[in-house]
Amino acid sequence: MSKKLKPFEILEDSCASVCIWLNGEPTAISNRAENLWNKAKYRVATDGAVNEILKRKSFVEWPHIICGDFDSINKQIDTKNAKVVHLPDQDYTDLSKSVQWCLEQKTLTSWEFENIVVLGGLNGRFDHTMSTLSSLIRFVDSQTPVIVLDSRNLVLAVPTGDSNLDVNLEMTTKMCGIIPIVQKETIVSSIGLKYEMENLALEFGKLISTSNEVTTSQVFLKSSSSLIFSIELENWVYKLDSL
């Protein structure tokens, strides 16, 4: 059975999401991201992100949860009424630990949410960017979608098998990438792209699909392994110029 993916739901006001604010380049958090953060049902900040949130305190809400190993937070910062969650495991990144903790709350507590939206994680240090993509692949089979939003892109992992992606064409430049992130040859077929693939072998160091283009609001992907799907947002979307 084909898996239905609706990543653009996170940009709707009615979407009940967890927002995770990552430490990273300040420019990665756009006006749109701030708006999503303020409207999120649950706001979760990694410890390093608290310093940046504090700088924006006049126009962003304080987090409900602050989590991490607390090696990046300014020790003088008052956590106020946020719940502090220590996640000291050094084998995983703050993002992976935060996503795992949120998914556990959905199972163990009364938390209810439709998506996990990650703010940032694609700008700045390259190794941090790769760790973000690794985290997406780690949770690709979760029943709760994990979607990364930075100052220009919307990025998610696509699972093995058949997937149908709903794309809001008006919100994008239509430029997209289908990246075989796993370290093995990945066989991909597609419907709804300018440069279609039919049982095409994608692999790092060989052929990958970048600067492709979405042509319809429904994109079908069939893959032998997990993929990263990225799409570029229109300027007005992430800058909120239209609101």
Curated annotation (Swiss-Prot):
InterPro entries: Thi_PPkinase, Thiamin_pyrophosphokinase_euk, Thiamin_PyroPKinase_B1-bd, TPK_B1-bd_sf, TPK_catalytic, TPK_catalytic_sf
Domain of life according to the entry: Eukaryota
GO MF annotation: an example: thiamine diphosphokinase activity
Any one Gene Ontology BP term: thiamine diphosphate biosynthetic process
Kinase is among the record's keywords: yes
Database matches in NCBIfam families: thi_PPkinase
Family indicated by similarity: Belongs to the thiamine pyrophosphokinase family.
Protein name: Thiamin pyrophosphokinase 1
